């Protein structure tokens, strides 16, 4: 898919209207601390609004309307003498046909127009690999971070990460426009913006594209950078980080008891001295937060451009923060538990006392990207879905099962197929299936890998996944029945209807992501050299070829139903036998 976009990479960015340009940042790569500067005094109190987005995943269609919301907030702050700071918490590009064709270039163009001040570096920012059609390096000359560096060069705002390090030297990376932090001035207020990346980055992107890098603990890195920025005169510190949590209750911002404390964000905040950070814009978990945690205002706003987060800080004339209002995520169109309406059907109403109007300049950027993708998107694949085919991250699903079946049809040399719940990104709607819909369900340009392993290895993969939380493994041509016996999990497995032989050798079709260490799937098996063979065939496109040949109607109820399960286990994952784990030691879970 990346080859289809090569012709647009040399286009120059449009000249932006002055009213939408972000405050010009002063990037930092941790130079020596500067002498403390006195806060700029103002004749009166000022309101600073921080708007946070996260995990856009290429959902360009949502940005013109979002720009309308931002414009209304900017107008309100301009009227009262305050200002607006717009930041993103990462995973900007990967996920839609219109974004992936240009390796995220149109997202950068739109963000430039919107006036972002900074963006965090998410794990999926590494997905595109080198500039060009390949998602991994083909030779030593290929830069496995080439596409990411190209997007940073085009951005009028920095990509910030304080904890992304060179593995060999232990020093922070020194790539153009990718500093640890930036300092901006908004309405006379000096704001330090610090970035951070999730500790799971090495195994939640293509591992080969992350070689030579490592992630340092985010808390100490943020604290060190905050001290430097405070010393340089920052009155407010904002963290934008591709790590987060999830909270069930958004009605009580001072009560985070409904939030998942096992997620990375709580450890990071726990490592920060009191008063280090004022606002924390989170991401990665595709969930919602609007809470005050350890005196830090924390926001996260789902994913795919459905909503945005907001914090209003009130600053005294001497520059110190006197209070804040944490807003719940502002859903811009439709309802969260229903499919997103098309932009033309959105009726956002008023916000900040005036109608929300999509921004025409952002709309022009989006329309251009959509037009390039339109022909490919609308291609009919020859099959009709009798009902919606749903995905699931943590449980067996019709979509996961179907995709594994299609993988086996494309690779008849394999006996089983496996994919991960994190790779399923969208449901498939009922009706004639189009390529664009398939793309959004499986947007990653992962290639086929064939893994030779023993039946004992397969049993370990199935058993381990059942006993862990996080992403489910979906299987093709494999069924398992798991029950607790004598305080241990007994798993009976069949392949092609026959009992699994622990001593036999099987060929497993999977993705190069999982085969190369993604999600930690194969790392514990200690497979011999030569057991993994990676091809140049993109899984999604091979699946599309199978569908074009098969045609017909697909019934999701035959792929998965309570009575048609490939993974038969009691209760919910993680399956536990015997005494439950001790309190205070939550299981680690993979994230989006």
What does each of the following model-derived ranges do?
Residues 1-11:
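Bacterial N-terminal signal peptides that target proteins for export
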Residues 17-18:
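C-terminal motif of bacterial Sec signal peptides marking the signal peptidase cleavage site
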Residues 46-49, 59-69, 156-163, 167-168, ...:
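Feature captures C-terminal
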Residues 326-327, 382-383, 450-452:
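Short amphipathic
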Residues 376-396:
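Glycine-rich phosphate/diphosphate-binding loops and the adjacent beta-loop-alpha structural elements
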